[in-house]
Regions:
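Conserved HGGG/HGGXW glycine-rich cap/lid loop of the alpha/beta-hydrolase fold
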Residues: 3-52
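Conserved alpha/beta-hydrolase "nucleophile elbow" surrounding the catalytic nucleophile
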Residues: 14, 80-82
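Active-site loop/oxyanion-hole signature of alpha/beta-hydrolase fold enzymes
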Residues: 25, 39-76
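Flexible "cap/lid" loop of the alpha/beta hydrolase fold
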Residues: 86-130
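Hydrophobic, aromatic-rich cap/lid helix
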Residues: 140-167
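Short beta-strand/loop motif that positions the catalytic acidic residue
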Residues: 172, 178-180
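Conserved alpha/beta-hydrolase "acid-adjacent" motif
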Residues: 183-191
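Catalytic histidine-centered segment of alpha/beta-hydrolase-like enzymes
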Residues: 207-219
């Protein structure tokens, strides 16, 4: 029998260019968690969805604070994808007592390294991408989404700040599940898993970065880890 309090909230944080509705609701996560009897909260990152969308990069300097401010008072189980996973890590570094368990999807060594991928994403959001490159075209399409705000996304990508340092993760001592696709450009997962004191890693089979939120393996592994599987 589970010892997870049935009223412990499950918090979901999406990636760049997404929203709680697009990433979690449309892929069934929120309904599954609710069917398991757990409270569920999808948080829109600053610059996305229903959140404010400032155009000043300085407004995004403490992106994680917007998430911390939206959290319930009690400790939560939290699941993040890509930028949402990084933001949850920053929250857990500052306030580890706010989290009982974390699931980090779509992140790995990219959290600690400056990569060409980051430049390609920024160029795509700015409208300067190679139209024949599927990777860049994905982010160009995000910027052109009529429900989004391309200027806000550009400001977010220009925000001040530095890459995470693995040593910062020493305080993230709660159980953490890292889920990364075998074809995800964010990998490998090893540097992230090794930096976390209490981490488990599961590789998502035949899964790239963009398919992660709709991967049935990802959904099953994540919900089982936070004890929010409906059956």
């Amino acid at each position: 029998m589970s010892d997870t309090p049935p009223d412990r909230p499950v918090v979901l944080v999406h990636g760049l260019g997404g929203s709680a509705a697009e990433t979690w609701q449309s892929n069934g996560w929120m309904d599954l968690i609710a069917d398991a009897g757990r409270p569920v909260l999808g948080i829109d990152l600053l610059g996305h969805g229903t959140a404010p969308k400032p155009h000043d990069p300085e407004a995004y300097a403490a992106l994680h604070q917007h998430v911390l401010d939206a959290l319930p008072d009690e400790p939560v189980d939290a699941i993040g994808f890509s930028l949402g996973a990084r933001t949850l890590l920053e929250c857990a570094i500052e306030a580890p007592h706010r989290f009982a368990r974390l699931v980090l999807t779509g992140v790995g060594a990219n959290l600690f390294e400056e990569r060409e991928d980051h430049h390609r994403i920024a160029e795509a959001i700015a409208g300067n991408a190679d139209p024949t490159d599927p990777f860049s075209r994905y982010f160009t399409d995000l910027a052109q989404n009529p429900d989004g705000d391309a200027d806000a996304l550009r400001a977010l990508l220009q925000r001040p700040g530095e890459r995470l340092d693995p040593a910062q993760l020493d305080v993230v001592s709660m159980p953490v599940l890292v889920l990364l696709g075998d074809a995800d450009f964010a990998g490998p997962a090893d540097p992230l898993v090794e930096a976390l004191p209490n981490a488990t890693f599961r590789e998502l089979r035949r899964c790239d970065h963009f398919a992660t939120p709709r991967s049935m393996q990802c959904i099953d592994e994540a919900l089982a880890f936070v004890d929010a599987a409906p059956f």
